[in-house]
């Protein structure tokens, strides 16, 4: 087992190395002027009492047919993934009319990192199978994502996705969200938390949502076996799951993964 500081360095290094901000800016403003960054927004859903914090959005077309919510990993922000979703950035949406919403997690003390404050969707106590799980934090983050979904037009198809810790929240919301327009779920380098709480906590109609999981076979942070176990649990529950591994990829992303996600979205939406 690696030391906590080393594991946190791997987490932070992996999440921040995914997309270079400079490349993101040039693609969005120069080559693809039609994809407009909507900027940061901070709102509070009074009905739920949930502060949604800041988020960034990229929109192409006046009336999105598809909205993707993508959650970053531990220690990162929305900026770390924005470049993957501008046209030509990596992930291709199956419609010219879309919106991508990238929330940023609130800053929390992370037990695994000796209480250091960083953007986190929930606390992490350890990275082994027997570690304590922050159930309350996971469910709070899932509710935040569900509140964002509720703000979208009911006719818009919704995709929930994320990387690492963000993927764990996306999977949780994908199984629990009651919104009928949630159409697909994507998780990269991630795992399904609270697996024993299902099927009792599944939302009506959740089993209709296809799930696409992706993992590097050299991941030293979230083990590939966690991804495999998540796939198997989802299949036990009755979900249609696709699972892809990428040779030599650590806790990161790669062009082949983006291509696979693009193909999944094209076939699922």
PLM features: what roles do these ranges have?
Residues 1-23:
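N-terminal chloroplast transit peptides
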Residues 27-35, 41-43:
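N-terminal mitochondrial targeting presequences
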Residues 38-156:
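Serine-hydrolase catalytic machinery in alpha/beta-hydrolase-like enzymes
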Residues 66, 209-210:
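Alpha/beta-hydrolase fold active-site loops
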Residues 81-85, 199, 223-233:
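Short alpha-helix in the alpha/beta-hydrolase fold that links the catalytic acid
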Residues 154-204:
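Primarily recognizes the serine-hydrolase "nucleophile elbow" in alpha/beta-hydrolase
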Residues 212-215, 219:
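Short beta-strand/loop motif that positions the catalytic acidic residue
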Residues 225-269:
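C-terminal catalytic histidine-bearing segment of alpha/beta-hydrolase fold enzymes
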């Amino acid at each position: 087992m690696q030391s906590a500081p080393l594991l946190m360095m791997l987490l932070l290094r992996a999440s921040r190395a995914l997309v270079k901000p400079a490349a993101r800016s040039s693609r969005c403003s120069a080559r693809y002027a039609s994809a407009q960054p909507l900027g940061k927004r901070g709102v509070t859903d009074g009905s739920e009492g949930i502060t949604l914090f800041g988020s960034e959005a990229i929109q192409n077309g006046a009336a999105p047919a598809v909205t993707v919510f993508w959650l970053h990993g531990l220690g990162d922000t929305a900026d770390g993934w924005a470049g993957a979703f501008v046209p030509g950035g990596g992930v291709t949406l199956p419609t010219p009319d879309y919106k991508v919403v990238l929330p940023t997690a609130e800053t929390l003390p992370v037990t695994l990192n000796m209480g250091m404050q960083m953007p986190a969707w929930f606390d992490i106590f350890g990275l082994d199978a027997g570690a304590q799980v922050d159930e309350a934090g996971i469910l709070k983050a899932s509710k935040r994502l569900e509140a964002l979904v509720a703000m979208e037009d009911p006719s818009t198809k919704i995709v929930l996705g994320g990387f690492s810790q963000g993927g764990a929240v996306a999977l949780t919301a994908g199984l629990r969200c009651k919104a009928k327009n949630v159409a697909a779920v994507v998780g990269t380098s991630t795992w399904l938390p609270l697996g024993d709480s299902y099927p009792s906590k599944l939302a009506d109609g959740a089993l209709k949502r296809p799930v696409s999981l992706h993992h590097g076979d050299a991941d030293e942070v979230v083990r590939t076996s966690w991804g495999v176990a998540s796939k198997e649990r989802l299949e036990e529950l009755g979900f249609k799951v696709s699972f892809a591994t990428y040779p030599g990829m650590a806790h990161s992303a790669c062009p082949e993964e983006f291509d696979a996600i693009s193909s999944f979205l094209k076939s699922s939406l």
